[in-house]
Amino acid sequence: MDLHLEGKVIIVTGGFRGIGKGIVLQLAQEGAIPVVINRSDKAMDEFKHDIEQYTTTYDTYLLDLNDTDKIAPIVEETYKKYGHIDGIVNNAGKNDNKDLETTSWREFEESIHGNLTHYYELVHAAVPYLKESKGSVVNISSKTALTGQGKTSAYAAAKGAILGLTREWAAALVGDGVRVNAIVVSECWTPLYAEWIKTFGDEEAQKARLSVITDKIPLEHRMTTTEEIGNEAAFLLSDRSSHTTGQWVFVDGGYVHLDRALS
């Protein structure tokens, strides 16, 4: 299916690795122009190698998104260069395990800022241009917003707020033809996830832990792939989803909604 994303300018945060990279590569395959904001250049060489299998028309910016005031200038520069901005993917963030018992309110607030404020600022800065293009916003959220995890209060709060903002922005911008949706991720295999699994010990212990997790995923008892998240994001950014807004889309193999008895 042609998603008609050829030449569309899409800004993606956290796009060098993991879910963000999966989204960027899918956009590149569809002919879009990804503008990627990433905190570190650590994975840049591999990222460039992979994206250039599909396109050489893309931009990268190195920015710690905690430096909120530096987000709008990137948006302005992008618009000045291309004359249009057609979509935003808010993806960057980290589950930092700031739990209820040991996290001070200052640490809680800092975590919220790192996982939420840049979502707001990027869309805030891009709104005039999204109205011009009748563009689309995709916010990446997490199952922790709905299920909890037990030891990550700040991250869960930020991801819950992202779902609220998705509905709010969809309502605020519907009259301008701008669509806003969220993808809710559960258990997705990424480099960070792989690093976490390694903390459980030797290879046998890692496999055992992974089996406990995948057994709870009803569809095929496997992890979601970054490519599957990328496919959904590309669809939501495209005109093929032209009457879809304000939705929380669960790309999770039924993890959140299906009866645990199925596992």
Please annotate each region the language model reported.
Residues 182, 204-244, 251-253:
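C-terminal helical subdomain
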Residues 142:
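Residue(s) in the substrate-gating loop at a strand-loop-helix junction
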Residues 99-100, 104-112, 213:
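Substrate-binding pocket helix/loop in short-chain dehydrogenase/reductase
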Residues 9, 16-18:
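Conserved glycine-rich cofactor-binding loop
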Residues 128, 171-175, 242:
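Alpha-helical segment proximal to the catalytic Tyr-Lys
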Residues 147, 234, 245-263:
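Short C-terminal tail/terminal secondary-structure segment
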Residues 123, 158, 166:
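Active-site helix of classical SDR
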